[in-house]
Amino acid sequence: MVKRLSNRMVFKDKAPLEVDVIVFSAGIRPQDELARQAELEVGERGGIVINNQCQTSDENIYAIGECALWGQKIFGLVAPGYTMARTTADVLTGMPSEGFK
């Protein structure tokens, strides 16, 4: 728990810290070990490379969500994962699909 007071923060343990600015950053690291073992293409910094249909470098294997790398981007949000899931479902069932964008 952090409490903000003008140019000072006071942490839960009551320790103060004088600040001009606070930057908070969080990130994700894709879990792609299985893809590496399967010799699928993965990005330099991780993530299973997919195309617009969410296919990996093996056209019979799909990847969606935080493990997927599309356009050199990893999406740490749930909404892109839902869109990838819809795209994959459409492709697998032969439905028209604009692909993941």
What are these regions (language model features)?
Residues 2-10, 15-90:
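FAD-site-proximal beta/loop scaffold in flavoenzymes
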Residues 41-45, 95-101:
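A short alpha-helix-loop-beta-strand transition element characteristic
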